[in-house]
Amino acid sequence: MSKEKIVLAYSGGLDTSVAIAWLKNKGYDVIACCIDVGEGKDLEAIKEKGLQVGAWKSVVIDAKRDFAEQFVLPALQAHAMYEQKYPLVSALSRPLIVQKLVAVANQYGATAIAHGCTGKGNDQVRFEAGIHALAPEMKIEDPIRDWHWSREEEIQYAKDNGIPVPITKASPYSIDENLWGRANECGILEDPWAAAPADAYDRTVSIEEAPDTPTTIEITFNEGVPTAIDGEEMPLDQLIMKLDKLAGSHGIGRIDHVENRLVGIKSREIYECPAATVLLAAHKDLEDLTQEREVAHFKPLIEQKMSGIIYNGLWYSPLMKSLVAFIDESQAVVNGVVRVKLFKGNVICEGRKSPNSLYDKNLATYTSADEFDQEAATGFIKLWELPDKVYAQVQNKNKKKVKENTSDAY
């Protein structure tokens, strides 16, 4: 009789390696699945390690391009920033990982999926809500949430099951990273008054260490999609990686944020999002040039709602699909080039041009070349002010009547 199969979201670290043994001891054939969203890991080494520690099968998937095009791009076009500050680094990768885990489960006939999230964070919700949105009958296991071990007990379990324990200096931080950025928490960062030390950062230099000379680049967008830097076209994932290094070298993208977690607690996080910071600024700048006024004023409502949906793990909800449809429609006119200066932590959009520009210099100028019909303003103002004017007239008339009636009473 064949064993029940389970797909484990596998990182190659101690926690998920121990999870392989724990799930095996529970009676599963474990399919270790490592999905690369831009962490820079050695996929082949992770694949081999999964087999060495007891996985029935080990699968690695390079999903950087899918991540960039299917998940990062909609968030960029929606200017998705949780609480107006966090570009949703980890939250964006979870629905992509879920998508791949479910696909692998279907491929191998697995009846369950396992993840390695704690019972205190947002990710457990994102994984499980996403899995059940795509595969409602799929069973879910969470070894780390279930076993309640101390670090010492986990290490002993690893030794008992022949799992190599890495002998390295323990990092005080908990780090998650992908193409779109790097998230760091724990250690001294748990004190919101303490300044983040230098070793909390990896993708960015400090403002003090940033070059004294700015770098100016031009970013090209086609229907809201960044397609080129300084005229050099490249796939979105490569563009993000290139821009990440460049912007990070100028100290751009450091975010120190105390955020409201889905599970009800506040958490202090240090984020590094160099490419995201630049692209969000440039995309918004081009939209300012090309979006019609009512669309431009309404779109932030959609952006805020989408940010919350992504953060709270509801990427596959019906509402998300509807909101993305609005964003897609709004991007048809977002074509052009934005000139951006990078300097000591600052992103300065200093020029923009577009074939869809709604800026008309002849209407905007205050010189003799002005084509704006100022005489038309008089009639427009009379119509525009009419509701408030009539309201004021009626109120004044009623106040006068009340005053007269009061005088007559005496």
Swiss-Prot record:
<dbReference type="InterPro" id="IPR023434">
    <property type="entry name" value="Arginosuc_synth_type_1_subfam"/>
</dbReference>
<keyword id="KW-0067">ATP-binding</keyword>
<comment type="pathway">
    <text>Amino-acid biosynthesis; L-arginine biosynthesis; L-arginine from L-ornithine and carbamoyl phosphate: step 2/3.</text>
</comment>
<feature type="binding site">
    <location>
        <begin position="9"/>
        <end position="17"/>
    </location>
    <ligand>
        <name>ATP</name>
    </ligand>
</feature>
<dbReference type="InterPro" id="IPR048268">
    <property type="entry name" value="Arginosuc_syn_C"/>
</dbReference>
<feature type="binding site">
    <location>
        <position position="122"/>
    </location>
    <ligand>
        <name>L-aspartate</name>
    </ligand>
</feature>
<keyword id="KW-0055">Arginine biosynthesis</keyword>
<dbReference type="InterPro" id="IPR048267">
    <property type="entry name" value="Arginosuc_syn_N"/>
</dbReference>
<keyword id="KW-0547">Nucleotide-binding</keyword>
<dbReference type="Pfam" id="PF00764">
    <property type="entry name" value="Arginosuc_synth"/>
</dbReference>
<dbReference type="Pfam" id="PF20979">
    <property type="entry name" value="Arginosuc_syn_C"/>
</dbReference>
<feature type="binding site">
    <location>
        <position position="123"/>
    </location>
    <ligand>
        <name>L-aspartate</name>
    </ligand>
</feature>
<dbReference type="InterPro" id="IPR014729">
    <property type="entry name" value="Rossmann-like_a/b/a_fold"/>
</dbReference>
<feature type="binding site">
    <location>
        <position position="174"/>
    </location>
    <ligand>
        <name>L-citrulline</name>
    </ligand>
</feature>
<feature type="binding site">
    <location>
        <position position="122"/>
    </location>
    <ligand>
        <name>L-citrulline</name>
    </ligand>
</feature>
<dbReference type="InterPro" id="IPR001518">
    <property type="entry name" value="Arginosuc_synth"/>
</dbReference>
<feature type="binding site">
    <location>
        <position position="126"/>
    </location>
    <ligand>
        <name>L-citrulline</name>
    </ligand>
</feature>
<dbReference type="GO" id="GO:0000050">
    <property type="term" value="P:urea cycle"/>
</dbReference>
<dbReference type="GO" id="GO:0006526">
    <property type="term" value="P:L-arginine biosynthetic process"/>
</dbReference>
<keyword id="KW-0436">Ligase</keyword>
<comment type="subunit">
    <text>Homotetramer.</text>
</comment>
<dbReference type="InterPro" id="IPR024074">
    <property type="entry name" value="AS_cat/multimer_dom_body"/>
</dbReference>
<feature type="binding site">
    <location>
        <position position="86"/>
    </location>
    <ligand>
        <name>L-citrulline</name>
    </ligand>
</feature>
<feature type="binding site">
    <location>
        <position position="259"/>
    </location>
    <ligand>
        <name>L-citrulline</name>
    </ligand>
</feature>
<dbReference type="GO" id="GO:0005524">
    <property type="term" value="F:ATP binding"/>
</dbReference>
<dbReference type="GO" id="GO:0000053">
    <property type="term" value="P:argininosuccinate metabolic process"/>
</dbReference>
<dbReference type="GO" id="GO:0004055">
    <property type="term" value="F:argininosuccinate synthase activity"/>
</dbReference>
<keyword id="KW-0028">Amino-acid biosynthesis</keyword>
<feature type="binding site">
    <location>
        <position position="116"/>
    </location>
    <ligand>
        <name>ATP</name>
    </ligand>
</feature>
<feature type="binding site">
    <location>
        <position position="271"/>
    </location>
    <ligand>
        <name>L-citrulline</name>
    </ligand>
</feature>
<dbReference type="InterPro" id="IPR018223">
    <property type="entry name" value="Arginosuc_synth_CS"/>
</dbReference>
<comment type="similarity">
    <text>Belongs to the argininosuccinate synthase family. Type 1 subfamily.</text>
</comment>
<protein>
    <recommendedName>
        <fullName>Argininosuccinate synthase</fullName>
        <ecNumber>6.3.4.5</ecNumber>
    </recommendedName>
</protein>
<feature type="binding site">
    <location>
        <position position="118"/>
    </location>
    <ligand>
        <name>L-aspartate</name>
    </ligand>
</feature>
<dbReference type="GO" id="GO:0005737">
    <property type="term" value="C:cytoplasm"/>
</dbReference>
<keyword id="KW-0963">Cytoplasm</keyword>
